[in-house]
Amino acid sequence: MSELIQNVTTTFAQLFGYDATHLVQAPGRVNLIGEHTDYNDGFVLPCAINYQTVVAAAKREDFLVRLVAVDYDNDTDEFDLREEIAFQPKKMWSNYIRGVIKCLIERGFEFNGADIVVSGNVPQGAGLSSSAALEVVIGQTFKELYQLKISQAEIALNGQQAENQFVGCNCGIMDQMISAQGQANHAMLLDCRSLQTEAVAMPEQMAVVILNSNKKRGLVESEYNTRRQQCEAAAKTFGVKALRDVTLAQLTAKQAELDPVVAKRARHVITENERTLHAAQALREGNMPRLGELMAASHASMRDDFEITVKEIDTLVEIVQSVIGDQGGVRMTGGGFGGCVVALVHPKQVEAVQQAVAEHYEAATGLKASIYVCHATSGAGLVELA
């Protein structure tokens, strides 16, 4: 993160002519298990990762907000808080910030303007929640600058609202919640219905390895919407609000009444919720063989019942699995149809995993994987100014 801090503080001083008073960060995340359960009111188990979005900021006496995006060639934007905050079709990066600030105002928070320089190293388009990190870091920045009486959970909800209503992208609450509330060396078990969270300690000797398949993700939106509709149709058959409320026994008893594809989709969600709760327990106990079993079952369910994996992802999972055996776990993570694989491995195995992927993945798929070796880090907050 030190390079990011250097970038934002130097750029701030150069472009604004004075030093920033606050440095704030919010992390990206990876979901360890619990896929496509969020919109079914289920459980997820993400952790925050040590790839962050960082802001250098200072209060203003007036109501101007001046923005600089280091990662977009120091592109700038500015607006007045007393005027209507409008969507900018030509500056997508700025809309996440505008949306967060607009939603804070609508929630009744009062503050003046700010000078803000932002930069991040969360890989974009890899499904590691660079957008949620940006939304959360902006909410956190105004909290820190103006001592706003806002909880971390509300910062997360405010970010989700900005993405849904202002940016116009439908997302669950997981990404913002883990970015706002993550704890170092812990995963977070999140109940997507009650929004209750529980920090789950991770074994000390564990690396979180994220492997981007670099398979271009096609069909994501249309297939995602289809899966949501199928899950809603299944819930309707059972007369419940969401698949969270259906047991496997109930599904089996009514299977004949369901469309076979809908039944498969429902089976994934119901079993994935169970697996996520069991995985949290295995993590607490440091039971790697059990965690590995659950992650393998999760991947098989996404492949066979939810049908969201692709050949490249399955290949990547098989390569990693062959290296780690029962001493860790690996599965696809994220929406599907490409994207990333997450592996929980002993630090001593990281090099062997990297080597196996380098040797076999490109040969099998024609693609090179990008590998990020991470650890579970803390959620959004102030970075001490050195």
UniProtKB/Swiss-Prot annotation:
> Which PROSITE patterns does this entry report, sorted A to Z?
GALACTOKINASE, GHMP_KINASES_ATP
**GO cellular-component terms in the record?**
cytosol
Q: Which reaction does it catalyse?
A: alpha-D-galactose + ATP = alpha-D-galactose 1-phosphate + ADP + H(+)
The residues that hold substrate are: E35, H36, T37, D38, Y224
Q: Which InterPro entries does this entry report, sorted A to Z?
A: Galactokinase, Galactokinase_bac, Galactokinase_CS, GalKase_N, GHMP_kinase_C_dom, GHMP_kinase_C_sf, GHMP_kinase_N_dom, GHMP_knse_ATP-bd_CS
Q: Where in the cell is it found?
A: Cytoplasm
Give the binding site residues for ATP.
Answer: G125, A126, G127, L128, S129, S130, S131
Q: What class of enzyme is it?
A: transferase
Q: Which residues bind Mg(2+)?
A: S131, E163
Keyword tags: ATP-binding, Carbohydrate metabolism, Cytoplasm, Galactose metabolism, Kinase, Magnesium, Metal-binding, Nucleotide-binding, Transferase
Question: In this UniProt entry, which residues are annotated as the site Transition state stabilizer?
Answer: R29
One annotated GO biological process: galactose metabolic process
Q: What this chain does, per the record? A: Catalyzes the transfer of the gamma-phosphate of ATP to D-galactose to form alpha-D-galactose-1-phosphate (Gal-1-P).
Q: What family does this chain come from, according to its entry?
A: Belongs to the GHMP kinase family. GalK subfamily.
This chain's protein is named Galactokinase
Give the encoding gene's name.
Answer: galK
